[in-house]
Amino acid sequence: MIDYSNEVFTAIGNAVRAEHANVAIVGENIRQPSSFPCVAMDETYNVPSQLSSSDAEEYAAVTYRVQVFATGEGKRAQAREIFATVAKTCHGLNLIRKTYTTTPDLYNSSIYQISATFEADIRSDGMIFRR
């Protein structure tokens, strides 16, 4: 299995921490964080997209889910600012955003959440290609 999720998550986490103070970073899918603001990341899809003649994986198609949680006064603006950093970092890594959703108003939640997915192909040496 071609797995560069730690490298991707580290790059995103470092960028978020550099631009936003006191953001919790979590490397798994969560329903609700224990502290706010929070960025949660997980790999939801990783399958071979090309094999070599010896059946070794050459490329993997991957999808990463990123969730941004904020609460309190200005929660929407805060979540969007943090997400902008995530999106800019992912774009720099050649990860393309495929989905973007926010917490539906029907929940009348005190927590604002942005959830997005980013996709790419990763070569066995870690090079990331847009697809």
Predicted regions, residues:
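Short, charged interaction patches at domain edges and termini
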Residues: 1-11, 32, 46-61, 96-131
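Small/polar-rich, solvent-exposed N-terminal microdomains that initiate assembly or binding
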Residues: 1-52, 74-75, 81-82
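Compositionally biased, intrinsically disordered low-complexity segments
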Residues: 19, 85, 89, 114-117
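Secondary-structure transition/hinge residues
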Residues: 20, 74, 94, 126-128
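Short secondary-structure junctions
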Residues: 22-27, 94-102
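Residue-level recognition of well-ordered beta-strand positions that form the cores
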Residues: 42, 65-69, 117-121
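Mid-chain, well-packed structural core segment of small domains
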Residues: 65-91
